[in-house]
Regions:
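Serine residues within intrinsically disordered or low-complexity segments
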Residues: 260-263, 392, 470, 477
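Conserved anchor residues at repeat-unit boundaries in beta-strand-based tandem repeats, strongest
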Residues: 6-16, 30-42, 54-63, 77-88, ...
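Short, surface-exposed secondary-structure junctions/capping segments
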Residues: 96, 190, 237, 331, ...
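Long terminal segments
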Residues: 451-479
Length: 479
């Protein structure tokens, strides 16, 4: 017998046997109940130094059998089975926050099947335990009403399981690792849209498919940390779709964009969801463009083709328009090489016949000849001078095929008009006024040697009679 602790009760052969009380050295009671061979045996009450106490069965000095542990305030701490001083078997355990557990225990820990309740008596967890932790199959209820049914390991969701909204709709159905969505799974959005594929650390990661609420595919391909990234196919509501490279949820890299009927709309490079880099675009009328893009607009060098492969335009583009230097081909075979602005010939350029002979070279404004330019007639004659609104106006010169001047002077609406000088092929020439390409007004006709042939008024190219005519040194009056 321990002489350091005081005992009051039955003794047999100098040993505690029967009913008795054992006190701590400070005088506080330690145990009251049955003894056998100096040990707690049978039914008794044991007081812990912290004020908690136990009432129940003992064997060989240890809690063994049925018993109840209490907090010092008298509230129950545990009620159930014991084996060799440990909670083991069926029991009910309470904590100070009001939570309690009903189920199987082993080695002082929840082990086997059991139910954990919150302070309001609502089930928090119903399932299997190993060494005090959720492990095996179990159902857990969250504060917001959502709940999980599935596998657990080491107190965390691990393995296959299903997470539900409180109304029973599925949030996630799949694999878990250390409480997180990890592996293969199916995730449902509140609006009914869902994702089937791989997860990592709660995030879509790996291969997967996104669907609308009615089951139509939105995206199928690679994900990285919850964003579309890698190779994939994106589907639009109207039926068009994209196949290619993706980064940060946007088309990035090489890809193809298709219409709802499966025909290619664009194939080439993308940056942040826009056509950017080198690409080929197919128009509804069969025409197509190959060249540079920026911000989904034609920008830089490119070539526009009609459906049979003939070139319409090749050159520079700015914000989808012909702008800069380029070459434009007309359907009749004629073509233009020069500057453009806002789709129009603007600046310096040259117009050609299909055979490559020049039609016009010079200035253009808003698709019309304007400024200084040179125009070539089919008969070989040509004009050099001022233009406005596609018409020769102002000062200019017309040349014969051999380069000799035919006319130099004023033009109005493409006609000799104003003051000018006209040279006949026989050497004679006229200096004076013109109207509507006819001699009209005051003027003089000269012989090749410079002597005056006629000096006077003209009306619609005809000398105004009567007049004074000077012919070779002979002067006469015409009546």
């Amino acid at each position: 017998m321990n002489t350091e602790e005081r005992y009051e009760g039955d003794l047999i052969n100098g040993m505690r046997n029967g009913q008795g009380k054992l006190y701590y050295r400070n005088g506080n009671i330690k145990y009251e109940g049955e003894f056998a061979n100096d040990k707690f045996e049978g039914t008794g009450k044991f007081y812990y130094t912290d004020g908690n106490y136990y009432i129940g069965q003992f064997k060989n000095g240890l809690k063994h059998g049925k018993g109840i542990e209490y907090y010092k305030n008298g509230k129950k701490k545990y009620e159930g089975d014991y084996a060799n001083d440990k909670k083991e078997g069926e029991g009910k355990e309470y904590d100070l926050d009001g939570y309690y557990y009903i189920g199987q225990l082993k080695n002082n820990s929840f082990h086997g099947k059991g139910i954990l309740y919150d302070k309001n008596g609502k089930i928090r967890y119903d399932g299997e335990y190993v060494n005090g932790k959720f492990e095996g199959i179990g159902k857990y209820y969250y504060d917001d009403g959502n709940y999980y049914i599935g596998q657990w390991k080491n107190g965390l969701r691990n393995g296959e399981g299903v997470l539900y909204f409180k109304d029973g709709r599925v949030i996630y159905d799949g694999e878990f690792v250390n409480d997180k969505f990890d592996g293969r799974g199916k995730f449902y959005e509140p609006d009914g849209g869902h994702y089937i594929g791989q997860f990592k650390n709660f995030l879509k990661h790996g291969r997967g498919i996104e669907y609308t609420s009615d089951g139509k595919k939105i995206y199928e391909g690679d994900f990285a940390y919850d964003k579309k990234e890698g190779e994939g196919t994106c589907y639009n509501e109207e039926g068009s779709y994209y196949i290619g490279q993706i980064k940060n949820d946007l088309f990035n890299g090489k890809g193809k964009y298709y219409s709802s009927n499966g025909s290619v709309i664009y194939e080439g490079e993308f940056i942040n969801g826009k056509y950017e880099g080198i690409g080929k675009y197919y128009y509804d009328d069969g025409n197509y463009y190959i060249g540079q893009w920026k911000n989904s607009l034609r920008n830089g060098e490119g070539v526009l083709y009609i459906q049979d492969g003939r070139v319409i335009y090749e050159g520079e583009f700015f914000d989808d328009k012909f702008e800069g230097n380029g070459k434009y081909y007309y359907l009749d075979g004629k073509y233009y090489i020069g500057q453009f602005k806002n789709f129009l010939k603007h600046g310096i350029g040259i117009e050609y016949e299909p055979n490559g002979t020049k039609i016009y070279e010079g200035g253009f404004i808003n698709n019309k000849r304007d400024g200084i330019g040179k125009y070539y007639n089919e008969d070989g004659q040509y004009y050099v001078g001022q233009w406005k609104d596609d018409t020769s106006v102002g000062k200019g010169t017309v040349y014969y095929q051999n380069g000799n001047v035919k006319y130099e002077g004023d033009f109005v609406n493409g006609k000799f008009d104003g003051y000018g000088k006209f040279y006949e092929e026989n050497g004679e020439y006229y200096i004076g006024q013109f109207k509507n390409s006819l001699r009209h007004g005051k003027g003089t006709i000269y012989f090749p040697d410079g002597s005056i042939k006629y000096d006077g008024e003209f009306v619609d190219n005809i000398p105004n009679i009567p007049n004074i005519i000077s012919i070779k040194n002979h002067i006469c009056s015409v009546k």
